[in-house]
Amino acid sequence: AATPAAVRVSVTAGSANHPVVTATDHPGVRAAAAAMAEVFGVEPYYTREGGSIHPVEMFDRLLGVPTVLVGFGLPDDRIHAPNEKFDLEQFRAGIRVLTRLWDGLASTLPRRAAHGR
């Protein structure tokens, strides 16, 4: 590390998650895309984002349950920074997307027995 002579730097590795990617052709992703297109009037743009939401990896590894993460923030929201904000209309649009998503999932995904996968 480029530090002043009086500064010592040490790095200790902590815990980490295994990476997870849900296929864009998964029924849950397609249902989320349809809900977003209906609410926002345009097809969503897919991105891969890094993050550390530990349950996502566990849902995938332990339960075999794919996870769809959907964001409603805007680039200028300064998420996790000073003066963080979240536009109220984006919040309302997110609610509309999620209600349509739940309807879409209910009609798209296969029903499973209460005791099985």
What are these language model-derived features?
Residues 2-117:
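An extended, acidic, His-containing surface patch that forms the Zn2+-binding/catalytic region
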